[in-house]
Amino acid sequence: MTSPQALQLIKDPDRLESRLKEIPAEPGVYFMRDSQDQILYIGKSKKLRSRVRSYFRKFNELGPRLELMVRQVAEIEFIVTDTEAEALALEANLIKQHQPHFNVLLKDDKKYPYLCITWSEAYPRIFITRKRRAEAKDDRYYGPYTDTHLLRQTLGLVKRIFPLRQRPKPLFKDRPCLNFDIGRCPGVCQQLIASEDYRKTIHKVAMIFQGRTSELIDTLTPQMEAAAENLNFEQAARIRDQINGLKTLGEEQKVSLPDDTVSRDAIALAADEQHACIQLFQIRAGRLVGRLGFVADAQSGPPGAILQRVLEEHYAGADPVEIPAEILVQTELPEAEMLATYLTEYKGRKVTLLVPQRQSKAELIEMVERNAQYELARTQRFSDRNAEAQKDLAELLDLPELPQRIEGYDISHVQGSDAVASRVVFIDGLPAKQHYRHYKIKNPNVTAGHSDDFASLAEVVQRRFRKFIEHPETDRLSDPDWPDLIMIDGGKGQLSAVVNALSGTGLLEDLQIVSLAKQREEIFLPGESLPLNTDPDQPGVQLLRRLRDEAHRFAVSFHRQQRTERMRRSRLDEIPGLGYERQKQLLAAFRSIDYIREASPEQLATVPLIGPRLAQQIYDYFHP
C-alpha cells in the first residue's frame, strides 16, 4: 500500500530502479498505483520486469495518455502466474473488478445498442438497450451492434418464431393479455409456464445471437420428426414454423466465403489522431450473424495493441461456444500467441489468429476496414460539432483552454425527503458515465418537510473534493479527476453556496464554476450579479444545457429509486420476522409489493429464507 506522501517513481530514480529489480522476469499481472493508493492501470506480460521497465525507459515514446499515467505512478505491484494465458485471464478479471482509469479503452458510445437477456430473472426478458446493468451479473449482453434497424428486425422475427414474454410488466393482474391468446406469449405473467420450461426457450433464442442458428435448426429437426411420428401434429407444425423462420433469418445474413463451415470473426479499425473506430464482423456457417462496433482512444496505443485489447475485452464476457475457430485481424497483434493460447484453453478447441493473405479472407478484412472508415467519418463529424461547442464555451466563459472535463451537479427531493444529488461528467462534450456519481444527502437539517438546496450543494462539493482538501500538496491540475469546468443547476444562490463551501480550501484558484438557471437558460459567474449576455441556442450554451438536463435526469432517477425503496421497506417492515435479508429475497423473486400481495402462501414459501410458516404470515398480512 502506498503512502499518501509517496513520491511519483519518475521523480525518485533510486527507488524506481530498486523497485524494478524486485520484479521477476516471469509471466503475470502488474498494478500501477498513484500516491493515493488508487489503481491507475492493470497490465499483463510474459516477462513482467521487461514490460514494466519499458514504461520508464521509453517514456518519451509512450504517447500523451500513457505519459500522463506514468507521471502519476507511485508504486508498482505484481502477481506472478504459471503461464501467459493465466496472466491474460487474471488481467481481464481484475480490470473488470477495479475499472482503472487508464484501462478504460472503449468509450461509452450510446449509439451502439446491445441485446440483453436477463438471466438474473426467473422468467428472463429479451430487449434492446444502450446501457449495461452492472448490478445484474448473470444477465448476458450481445453486441454492441452497429445496425440498430437490423437488430430490431431480427428481434421482431425471433419474437414471431418463439413464444416469448412480450411485456416487462403484466397488463392485467388476474389473466393473461391477448399475446397469450394468439400464441405469441406462453402466459409468463400468470406463470402458466414453468420457469424451467421457459428458460429452455430462451436458451434457443440465445443460440441465434451466439451465431448458432444452423446448430439450432439441427436440434429442432429431429424434435419435429419425433412429434410427427407420435401423431402430435400441432407440436410438429409449430416446430416446422420455427425452423422455416430460422432459415428465413439465415438467408438474409449470407456472405460469400469459401470453407463456410468454419466459424470466424474479422476485426479491423480506422483511426485519426483522436478516435479509433473498430468493426468486428461475426461469421458463422457462411452467414454474417453480427456486426459489432467499438470506439476507442487512438492515443491508447498502436493499431495492433488497440485491436488486441478490444478482442480481450470482447471475449472476456463471452460463453466458450461463442468464440470462433478463426479470428482474422487487420494487422499483427503484439501478443497474438498469448491471446490464441488463452482462447484455445477457454473454448476447449483450437482458436487461430491470423492476418489473412488469401484473397477471399483478405477481401473480408478490407470490407470490415471500409465499414470502419465510414464509422470514423461519422464520428469525426460528431466530434467536430462537440469541438465547436467546447470552443464556443471557452470563449464565452473566458477559459484559459478548452473545457475537456465538465462536471454538472443537481439536487433532487420532495420537500426535503429522500434528498439526493448527482454528479455527471462530460468528456470532450460526451457523457462519460463511468464517472457519474450519486450522493445521499447526510446533512441532519435536511429532512422531510425541511429542504435546503444550498446546504445540500455545499455538502456535495465538499465530499467531491475531499481528496484535494485533505491533501493540498496533490498536483491537482495533472490529476485526471480534476474538472476544467463545474456547472451547478440553479441560479445565483446555488452558485454562491458552492463557492462559499470551497472558500478557504485553496481550490477556487484552479476551479472554474458557473451555474445555469432553468427559467431563461441564464449563465451566472461567481461574484457577478447579472447573468452573461448569451444566445440560448449558441453551441456553448447548448452544451451546458445538455449537461444540466443530464444531471437533472440522473438526480431525479436516483431520488425515485430511493423513495420507492423506502416505501417498499416501510410496508414489509411491519411484518414480524421479516428482516432485511428476507425482504431482499422476496423483492428479488417478485419484483414489487403488488406481486408479493398477489402471491399464494405456496408461492411465497418457494423463496429462499421464507418457510411455510412465515409465508402464511406474509399472506395473512396482505389478506386480513
Curated annotation (Swiss-Prot):
SMART domains: GIYc (SM00465), HhH1 (SM00278)
GO molecular function: DNA binding; excinuclease ABC activity
Coiled coil, from the record: none
Matches recorded under SUPFAM superfamilies: C-terminal UvrC-binding domain of UvrB, GIY-YIG endonuclease, RuvA domain 2-like
GO cellular component: cytoplasm; excinuclease repair complex
Keyword Cytoplasm: yes
Residues in GIY-YIG domain copies: 25-104
GO biological process terms on file: nucleotide-excision repair; SOS response
Family: Belongs to the UvrC family.
Protein's name according to its UniProt entry: UvrABC system protein C
Source organism of the structure: Cyanothece sp. (strain PCC 7425 / ATCC 29141)
Record gene name: uvrC
